A protein has these predicted regions:
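Divalent cation-coordinating acidic motifs and surrounding scaffolds
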Residues: 2-257
């Protein structure tokens, strides 16, 4: 676990109504089962080689740009519109890490194909895809797309938070990242929690999210730079009120909506 070094500033940017929160919470109360956390299927994770292709003049970025993007019903139908898919790919290229919600495709070639569109201009992105979450026909997948030239992911530390009591509709996807630097021992590390709350039960799920956060900060890696990001299904005021009630302070944030 590394602290923020003097040369790097993390700029947290939420897209389309996503918000980012950060704090350290107290002990977990046991309602979410951390012992049954599920790893994301490794068969769905590409890019086993974590070494980025760099020029000899590689310079670590001074800023990491992290975004959240809820793409409603992101499937083959939507991606068949070339204009839409080109815009989505172009947006993602502007960031170092993008948390995606709303993937609804059972075609295992869908996400790799989207990745190829992101990289068709020479970009070097990879992704981590979580399992199907939700109930019955109301299911989706979460993903992280990231620029492997600026960040790397610990795939062994990626998991979906288990919810044995079914308190949250879409179980969050958690991933541990590290900024790529010339000295890996001083690199900034951080954990992202990709969430989409049920708009019908937002109040109840916001309460559950407090427990989810506690599980994540209590992980064995003891990473204390933890960010919640995604679609919280509430407006800024509602989210800030919730955060304040648990002692969580929102970060500086921008939205496109």
């Amino acid at each position: 676990m590394q602290k923020l070094s003097s040369w790097i500033l993390v700029s947290l940017i939420a897209l389309l109504g996503g918000y980012l929160l950060r704090d350290r919470l107290g002990p977990f109360d046991g309602n979410i089962d951390s012992n049954s956390q599920q790893k994301s299927p490794q068969s769905l994770a590409i890019g086993g080689d974590h070494q980025a292709v760099r020029s000899k003049a590689f310079t670590p970025p001074e800023t990491l740009r992290i975004a959240s993007f809820h793409i409603t019903a992101f499937n083959a139908n939507k991606s068949s519109n070339q204009k839409i898919i080109d815009i989505l790919a172009r947006v993602i290229r502007n960031f170092d890490v993008v948390a995606i919600q709303g993937i609804q495709s059972h075609d295992q070639t869908f996400v790799p194909h989207f990745l190829s569109l992101i990289n068709n201009d020479g970009a070097q992105f990879e992704y981590e895809l979580g399992p199907q979450v939700g109930r019955n026909t109301n299911q989706q997948q979460f993903a992280f797309f990231f620029d492997k030239q600026t960040v790397e992911i610990d795939r062994q530390a990626t998991y979906t938070v288990a919810d044995p009591h079914d308190r949250i509709l879409y179980e969050p996807l958690v991933a541990l990242f590290r900024a790529r630097t010339l000295n890996s021992e001083t690199a900034f590390t951080f954990k992202l929690v990709n969430v989409h709350l049920d708009p019908i039960n937002t109040s109840e799920e916001l309460s559950t999210l407090h427990d989810v956060y506690s599980v994540v900060v209590a992980d064995v890696d003891q990473e204390d730079d933890v960010l919640l990001l995604g679609n919280f299904s509430t407006d800024t005021n509602g989210l800030f009120d919730w955060g304040n009630s648990f002692g969580i302070q929102p970060t500086h944030q921008h939205t496109t909506a």
